[in-house]
Amino acid sequence: MKGEFQKRAGFVLLACLAAHSDGIPDEQFRRYLPVLEWGATDERNFVQKGVSWALRMVGLQSPGMRRACGKLAQKLAKSDRASARWVGKEALREFERKR
């Protein structure tokens, strides 16, 4: 259980950075997309929620990041892993609402 919350904490920090920091270049956030893709395959509920939050917040940074995160969300939504599908679909719903 401890590792689950440590892993979630990393994703939550990324979400908070994206939500509360202005002026960070897209390239800084783009580096974390492979990490988000990797984290989305974790079946643990709290980790999934952390990844979902981070992906959604990073995607709201700029139009370019929305496109990049949207592509990742579409890829995850088609995954054969249930956790990745959930993260992808959740992010796509958020991006549709925020248009």
PLM region descriptions:
Residues 1-99:
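Alpha-helical scaffold domains
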